[in-house]
């Protein structure tokens, strides 16, 4: 799978894959049960995409894909947060009925969970971006809080992802026995090795140089009329 194909897959995953219907949220709410089943389908798609990304043997390509994907994910999360807050949608309240609100709800739930998957599987790359981005920090804190109140993650196989993500990112204090489950088998995901660290630094230097060149090209220029004076 080349870079463009990989990016296309991840952007599709950022879109809502479940339709929210129903009224009151409770453990007996049939609409919530239906949503959770559809959420499971979306989660399988997300996890498969990350598994394929983890199996790439090109660290630079992984870096590029995650760079674009993370920026897109947080843009979607920020826009969806704005929509839900403007409409006074409460995470523990009735499930949205309006189509726009349904999409925003799904965006928040699915992308917050997806980011948790990325954090746990690619912690070094995510920390490289996340630790210096206060806006992302605020957004994911809100996203985790929202998701914890929806009931979507209750009593399911994906319930641990929110807690593990929060601990990995330092949002909550780590349990004494905390262990990122994906750092045990480092052969399947990005290894913690000197070559990786070196490649990560080289890629970051290259991207910073490219950004500086773009800034220089966009800098102020003397207009033709001024130069003729």
Swiss-Prot record:
InterPro entries per the UniProt record, alphabetical: Coiled-coil_dom_con_pro_134
Glycosylated residues in this chain: 148
A single BP term in Gene Ontology: embryonic liver development
Listed Pfam families: ERK-JNK_inhib
Locations listed in the record: Endoplasmic reticulum lumen; Secreted; Cytoplasm; Nucleus
Cellular component GO terms held in the UniProt record: cytosol; endoplasmic reticulum lumen; extracellular region; nucleus
Chief site of localization: endoplasmic reticulum
PTM comment: O-glycosylated, with additional sialic acid modifications.
Coiled coil regions in record: 196-218
Subunit relationships: Interacts with TADA2A. Associates with the PCAF complex via TADA2A binding.
General function of this protein: Molecular adapter required to prevent protein hyperglycosylation of HSP90B1: during translation, associates with nascent HSP90B1 and the STT3A catalytic component of the OST-A complex and tethers them to a specialized translocon that forms a microenvironment for HSP90B1 folding. In the CCDC134-containing translocon, STT3A associates with the SRT pseudosubstrate motif of HSP90B1, preventing access to facultative glycosylation sites until folding is completed, preventing hyperglycosylation and subsequent degradation of HSP90B1.
Protein name in UniProt: Coiled-coil domain-containing protein 134
Phylogenetic lineage: Eukaryota, Metazoa, Chordata, Craniata, Vertebrata
Gene: Ccdc134
